[in-house]
Regions:
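Amphipathic alpha-helical binding modules
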Residues: 77-117
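Short terminal alpha-helical segments
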Residues: 2-45
Length: 117
């Protein structure tokens, strides 16, 4: 991942479309492209089987949040650090980490919701 000056996002938040999100993932986290493609295929299959767009909507929301975080190197590092603590820390540390991860995800979803308005 490349860095940006003064803590600015590496790229603007893309529109919440499959094409735009794929391009953004390729820029901010190319190693995640196989997971993106696999999860898109799974969501499309579920949508077809159930004649329901909800799986694709969940996919887009999930990856929009992923891009929102990954395009901000410090935020992405904070999330990775808290994920490590949650996986390897004591019960008390894991509880704190879960709280911090929740705050990051809540702020991410709030920012994405505000941008849609």
């Amino acid at each position: 991942m490349t860095t940006s000056a003064a803590g600015r996002p590496l790229i603007p938040q893309p529109p919440s479309t499959v094409t735009a999100l794929r391009q953004a993932v390729a820029q901010v986290s190319p190693a995640a492209l196989p997971a993106f493609t696999r999860e898109l295929d799974e969501a499309a299959d579920q949508a077809r089987q159930g004649s329901d767009l909800a799986p694709l909507q969940r996919f887009i929301a999930q990856w929009a949040a992923y891009v929102h975080i990954q395009r901000q190197p410090q935020l992405a590092e904070d999330l990775r650090r808290w994920e490590r603590v949650a996986a390897t820390g004591t019960a008390e540390e894991a509880f704190k980490a879960a709280s911090e991860i929740g705050k990051i995800l809540d702020a991410t979803h709030a920012a994405l919701d505000a941008a849609r308005r």
